[in-house]
């Protein structure tokens, strides 16, 4: 049985849900969940939680993402990427200055609001935006708070008839639409634009070179080694502070007990989470400050019961 995170190199042409369904069949288990949607046209790092690790999906999803992207200026599209219909056109007749591009990218660093594209899975009034878009209905989209942690130009500008393209890398908070970011970059440079290529190169500290293709995963299943290649739950939670406890306290944590906040976590905020682990590194629960009882910790998520060990 696999209890960990499989690092999938998602191929182009599959939805994230397609990937989950394929792994469910491959591993013959329903306990599979992905950690952040990638559009079908996008490839790259897609962590897949399996077994007990499905309980930590939200914590893995919270991590920052890094992408290598290509933007093409000269025309915009209905989907903000290369798959949509042309919406507006403005030929690029003058060379773009690298200094201007870098200035725009620097300007975009930091916290900001972003309006998700109409062709997206964001829900408004219980329906996904792409359902409205396919029906030709434009609806008001709620702004989302995002953070661009880092963004940098990674290629020279190339020109092709009436368009110009360049590549950039961006590290951003969850929920950021890089294709919308590409449109914003184009606007700031004075041109309609769209995202012409995208690959996710990292999700938190999981990098592309750690990922496996479906073919490799199938071979691991055949060899009986797939569990060995899964990222353990404790490593998947290494962005959370860890509280190491005795086996006696671990048993209480597995039963959902409330604890006094340890001195080293006395300054933790209401939205903070800590991973509670045994001395041998097994994470048994995720704890949070008690909302109504000051000075106490309560379980936000119990990851393991004794019956599962």
From Swiss-Prot:
Report the Pfam families cross-referenced here: TruB_C_2 (PF16198), TruB_N (PF01509)
Q: Which GO terms describe its biological process?
A: mRNA pseudouridine synthesis; tRNA pseudouridine synthesis
Stated EC number for the protein is 5.4.99.25
Entry annotation: catalytic residues: 39
Among the GO molecular function terms of this UniProt record, one is:
tRNA pseudouridine(55) synthase activity
UniProt keyword tRNA processing present: yes
Q: Which domain of life is it from?
A: Bacteria
Task: Give the record's keywords alphabetically.
Answer: Isomerase, tRNA processing
What the entry lists under InterPro entries is as follows: PsdUridine_synth_cat_dom_sf (IPR020103), PsdUridine_synth_N (IPR002501), tRNA_psdUridine_synth_TruB (IPR014780), TruB_C (IPR032819)
Could you tell me what reaction this enzyme catalyses?
A: uridine(55) in tRNA = pseudouridine(55) in tRNA
Family, according to the entry, reads as follows:
Belongs to the pseudouridine synthase TruB family. Type 1 subfamily.
What exactly does this protein do? Responsible for synthesis of pseudouridine from uracil-55 in the psi GC loop of transfer RNAs.
This chain's protein is named: tRNA pseudouridine synthase B
Q: Which organism is it from?
A: Bacillus velezensis (strain DSM 23117 / BGSC 10A6 / LMG 26770 / FZB42)
| Gene transcribed to yield this protein | truB
């Amino acid at each position: 049985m696999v209890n960990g995170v499989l690092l999938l190199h998602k191929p182009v042409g599959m939805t994230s849900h397609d990937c989950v369904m394929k792994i469910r069949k491959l591993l013959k288990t329903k306990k599979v969940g992905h950690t952040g949607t990638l559009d079908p046209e996008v490839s790259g790092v897609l962590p897949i939680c399996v077994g007990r690790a499905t309980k930590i999906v939200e914590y893995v999803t919270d991590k920052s993402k890094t992408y290598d992207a290509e933007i093409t200026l000269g025309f915009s599209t209905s989907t903000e990427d290369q798959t949509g219909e042309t919406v507006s056109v403005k030929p690029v007749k003058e060379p773009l200055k690298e200094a201007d591009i870098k200035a725009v990218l620097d300007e975009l660093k930091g916290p900001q609001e972003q309006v998700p594209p109409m062709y997206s899975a964001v829900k408004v009034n219980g329906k996904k935006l792409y359902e409205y878009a396919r029906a030709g209905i434009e609806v008001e989209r709620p702004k989302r708070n995002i953070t661009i942690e880092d963004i940098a130009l990674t290629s020279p500008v190339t020109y092709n008839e009436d368009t110009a393209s360049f590549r950039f890398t961006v590290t951003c908070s969850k929920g950021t639409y890089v294709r919308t970011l590409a449109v914003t970059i184009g606007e700031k440079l004075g041109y309609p634009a769209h995202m012409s290529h995208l690959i996710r190169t990292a999700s938190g500290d999981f990098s592309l070179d750690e990922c496996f293709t479906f073919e490799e995963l199938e071979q691991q299943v055949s060899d009986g080694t797939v569990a060995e290649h899964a990222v353990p739950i404790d490593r998947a939670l290494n962005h959370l502070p860890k509280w190491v406890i005795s086996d006696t306290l671990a048993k209480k944590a597995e039963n959902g007990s409330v604890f006094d906040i340890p001195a080293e976590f006395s300054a933790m905020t209401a939205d903070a989470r800590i991973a509670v682990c045994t001395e041998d590194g097994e994470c048994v629960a995720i704890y949070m400050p008690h909302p109504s009882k000051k000075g106490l910790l309560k379980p936000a998520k119990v990851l393991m019961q004794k019956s599962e060990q």
